[in-house]
Amino acid sequence: MTPLIEVRSLSKFYPIKRAGRGARLHAVDDVDLTIGTGESVGLVGESGCGKSTMVRLLGRLIDPTAGQVLLGGEDLTAMTQAKFASSASRRRIQVVFQDATESLNPSFRAFQAIADPLKRLLGMNNGAEMDRRVRATAALVGLPEELLQRYPHQLSGGQRARVGIARAVAVEPSLLILDEPTSALDVSVQAVILRLLADLRARLAMSYLFVSHDLNVVRLLCSRVVVMYLGKIVEIAPAEMLFTAPRHPYTQALVAAIPDPARRGEARPRLDGSPTSPIDPDPNACRFYGRCPKGADICTTAMPPLRAVGPDHFAACHFALSPHGGTDER
């Protein structure tokens, strides 16, 4: 598969004050990732794992501390944010945010919201072609034409979500980053929007980076899954492999926590202990060690590298070559 996005040694550290001295919060730490052309990749992990920071880095909404983001071989991080915003590459990466209510301009009608990126990124002027493009995009996402003259507060949650998706796909991006796009919606509406997203990817041949805490949704929509913990990638695998044979203890706990009536009564992995602080963490220790039920002394002295444990399957655990993802030694 031809790479569309290549992330190389990407880091984002935030300077903070701790005990009266300077320190750094490691939101994303030395991440490598590739997203192929037409591929749908899921990004999962608990709150604070770095998912949202990755969204902002890939969308060039913030600058990295170190590392590169390449789009079709072009280094986006070599540009200032202002230069990127006016570059031809800007239209190739679009983001659909968690809450359309927050991301839509309240003074823009739905028509204006969809037209805005066409003006800014494609240089289209008001006229017949603009009108045709907006209406065609609205139809593509299932937004009735009569709703195009309404303001966001006059639309339902599902309708606002469709407007947010429409304004992102209107410029025909190569990569659509979806940051928890359905989490603010009712369950019944979520299902409809998820079907829409699956249909759009098939029809428009876009790549997806789907960020979610809902593993069932990720399993449904994504061909490959990336698991993050405290700024680090701990596992990457084809979706079915990750859900049926996870190798990292953290991934095993996430998968075991998915509600499943067939496993009722079974013992599930528990994550006890104290999480490692993301503030200046020990570079020589596994970030997950404080909560890991299968850690050993080596985990405190050697950061486990992300290494192959199977076909297209990688895990950052010293014991991941074991099919059970660890050892019981402590």
Model-assigned labels for residue ranges:
Residues 151-155, 159:
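Conserved ABC ATPase signature
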Residues 3, 17, 24, 236-330:
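Short catalytic/signature loops enriched in Gly
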Residues 75, 128-146, 199, 255-256:
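Conserved ABC ATPase "signature" region
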Residues 181, 185, 189-266:
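P-loop NTP-binding/switch modules centered on Walker-like glycine-rich loops
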Residues 59:
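Helix-to-loop junction immediately C-terminal to a conserved catalytic motif
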Residues 170-174:
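A short, proline-enriched helix->beta-strand linker immediately N-terminal to the Walker B motif
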Residues 67-78, 89:
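Conserved ABC transporter NBD signature motif
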